[in-house]
Regions:
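Extracytoplasmic/lumenal domain signature
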Residues: 1-126
Length: 126
């Protein structure tokens, strides 16, 4: 959604708003790209809440799948998003979960710390 959107009763006009398929654990800005990393978001919360209210027991499978993603059983996703348009420029599947707020960008490199205690350095394109 582009231009002047007001979400959730906020008095702040947004330049753009996009849902992303990631539960953000880390974000970092590098020039005109924001990098977002985290486990995949596999659940539509509004739909799930409606199913819970309707006492639909099949919703438990969806909740379990989202919990498995949060636990790291599905790795994580790294998105590169344009700050100008909100468009996803690229998507990378990572085999590990980043730590909370564990991303940094410097000199064309992106650094991610993981829950396994490692640091990964990704080199940017020129």
């Amino acid at each position: 959604k582009k231009g002047g959107n007001q979400q959730g009763g906020s008095g702040v006009a947004h330049n753009w708003t996009h849902d992303i398929p990631v539960l953000a654990r880390g974000m970092v800005l590098a020039k005109n790209i924001v990098f977002v990393a985290g486990p995949p978001d596999v659940m539509d919360e509004e739909e799930t809440f409606g199913r819970i209210k309707a006492r639909d027991d099949s919703v438990n499978e969806v909740i379990a799948k989202q919990q498995a993603a949060l636990d790291g059983n599905q790795g994580s996703v790294l998105l590169a998003i344009s700050t100008e348009t909100g468009e996803t420029l690229s998507k990378y599947d990572l085999g590990y979960l980043p730590t909370w707020d564990g991303m940094a960008a410097a000199n064309g490199n992106l650094f991610l710390s993981t829950e396994k205690g490692t640091i990964t350095c990704l080199k940017g394109k020129k």
